[in-house]
Each structure stands twice: as structure tokens, then as C-alpha cells.
Design a protein with these regions (language model features):
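N-terminal catalytic cores of peptidoglycan-degrading enzymes
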Residues: 1-85
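Basic/polar, cationic surfaces and motifs that engage anionic cell-wall
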Residues: 2-12, 18-23, 97-166
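Structural preference for beta-strand elements that scaffold enzyme active sites
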Residues: 28, 88-90, 147-149
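Cell-envelope and extracellular/periplasmic
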Residues: 35, 72, 82-100, 116-120, ...
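Short C-terminal domain-edge/linker segments immediately following a structured domain
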Residues: 60-64, 88-90, 120-125
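A broad "ordered helical/assembly scaffold" signature
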Residues: 71-79, 87, 116, 125-127, ...
Length: 166
């Protein structure tokens, strides 16, 4: 499959923290909360050191701009799960620093636009949220579907925060 990157990106700083080309086609999107109102430039700097051992495909700053840190063809190191990251486009979103880790409206609206863009470029017509870890991880998306997953299903974290569940 030929992978493309989002044209919504206004800032790029590629991180060395990735596993190279994916071993699974894209059929998941995993949004995250940054736990801070980090700009796309700050996120790029956070993901730059090899010692960080973390990255995401995209980030959305508090102003709604989109940054790219790992191209979609490559697996980011974002959700504490190799299996999830191999098939998910991962998106860090600027958020409040305390639970429920709310996103500003411009961040949320940009997240929606980015999800739609990812779906369209990958030939998907349905974005699914099942809300249940077992159901989601056991679900085999149809060729026209992408399913949402969350970081808290793979690590002892609140991410993406309870605001996303409201």
C-alpha cells in the first residue's frame, strides 16, 4: 500500500523514534492527550531525542495547527503497544494538565478534520468508536472501517482523559 501524509500539516520535525515501515495496514486511530498546552514545535522537540523513546505520527497544538513527527508509513512509539502502533495513526492533542484533560474547541475540531482526512486517504468511509476495550481489540475492521483505540487500554494511564469520553 502507498502511504500518504496529511496535507493539514503546517509543521514537520521528524523524530528518529519509530520502528520503520508498518507491518499492518492502517485501520485504527489513537488520539492522545499531551497533558499540557504544547505547541506543535514543542512536541517536535519532545520527540526529537532518541533517549525519549516516544513519538506520534501527528500532534495538534493549542492553536489547532497540525505537526507531523513520524510519517504515516512508519510505526510511531505512542500507545505502549507495538500491535496497536503498527496499525494506528497516533495523534497527540494539546490538553489541560489535569483530569479530565479537556481539549480546546479548536483542537477538537482539528482532530475531527484530521480523522476525516486519515479515513479518506486510507479508503475508509466509517470511523467507529465502540468504547469497550475487549470489544474493540477483538473487532476485525471491515476494509472500509477505521476504529478508535485509546492509550489507557495499553498502559496504566488516563490518556486520552475523561473529557474525550464525555
Amino acid at each position: 500500500m502507498a502511504y500518504t501524509n496529511s496535507l493539514l500539516v503546517s509543521y514537520t520535525k521528524l523524530s528518529p523514534n519509530h520502528s520503520g515501515q508498518r507491518t499492518h495496514s492502517i485501520d485504527r486511530i489513537t488520539p492522545h492527550c499531551v497533558v499540557g498546552q504544547c505547541s506543535v514545535e514543542t512536541l517536535g522537540n519532545i520527540f526529537l531525542p532518541v533517549s525519549r523513546q516516544a513519538s506520534s505520527n501527528y500532534g495538534i497544538g493549542p492553536d489547532g495547527r497540525v505537526g507531523m513527527y513520524v510519517e504515516e508509513k512508519n510505526r510511531s512509539w505512542c500507545s505502549s503497544s507495538n500491535a496497536n502502533d503498527q496499525r494506528a495513526v497516533t495523534i497527540e492533542c494539546a490538553s489541560d494538565t489535569t483530569e479530565p484533560y479537556a481539549f480546546r474547541d479548536v483542537v477538537y475540531q482539528t482532530l475531527i478534520k484530521l480523522c476525516v482526512d486519515i479515513c479518506k486517504r486510507n479508503g475508509k468511509t466509517k470511523l467507529l468508536w465502540l468504547g469497550d476495550k475487549a470489544k474493540t481489540l477483538n473487532y476485525n475492521p471491515k476494509p472500509d472501517e477505521i476504529i478508535l483505540t485509546v492509550h489507557r487500554w495499553f498502559a496504566n494511564k488516563s490518556c486520552p482523559g475523561n473529557w474525550m469520553y464525555a
